[in-house]
Amino acid sequence: MKRLYILSLLIVLAACTTRPAQLRTGDLIFVGIPENYRIAGSMAEAISVSTNQDSLNIIHTAIADVRGDSVWIIDATIKHGVDRHPLDTFLNDFTLKDGSYPRFIVKRLKDNKDAERYVERARGYTGLGYNRCFVPCDTALYCTELVRDSYRRPDGSYIFSEAPMNFKAPDGTMPEYWTELFAILGMDVPQGIPGTNPRAMMEEECLKYVGPVSVLPQ
């Protein structure tokens, strides 16, 4: 009887042990920082304030490009523009001020059969600049704009939707960063113009949560 109990306990423990998932080509990596995390005067701060929900601010979206044992990241950032680089570069770019990592949330299309085609299209955008003004531009893309333009069906239609962009803080005020940035660009803040953002994209119905993956810090 005792032996049977121990065996049953071991089976239950084994069932409760979750193995890290494997990152696949086409997976989307969402970068989340603590709600109270601030980087004075940075775009990350402005994005986190304007997309603030729950206790985690989703500030960036990147595309995984897995080739054998090598993991590459395709994303659009101020530092690199639209670029394909090793995972280590991505992790280094998003290391927080105290040396820790943000939270990485991995999601995958529920219908992922065309992932290679989406990633191939994303690779074709490398070399473009970073779209700082967040309005359509032939020579630059911002992070979720890159994803939306890359993930299109065979007929050219978009998988991810657009919504009116919100640059305001939860209290309705406009962060100074955005006001100053767009003034330098000689334009008004494009509040309400159709676009995408990491938080809204992460919550799209076409995606499913993958869980912790072995190659990303937890």
Show where each model-derived region lies.
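Active-site nucleophile-His-acid catalytic modules used for acyl/amide transfer and hydrolysis
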Residues: 46-47, 101-165
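C-terminal motif of bacterial Sec signal peptides marking the signal peptidase cleavage site
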Residues: 14-15
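Positively charged n-region of N-terminal signal peptides that target proteins for export
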Residues: 1-4
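Loop/turn positions that initiate beta-strands
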Residues: 26-29
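Activation targets extended, charge/polar-rich intrinsically disordered C-terminal tails
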Residues: 135-218
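Sec-dependent N-terminal signal peptides
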Residues: 6-9
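Glycine-rich catalytic cores of cysteine/serine-nucleophile enzymes that process amide/ester linkages
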Residues: 33-104, 130-138
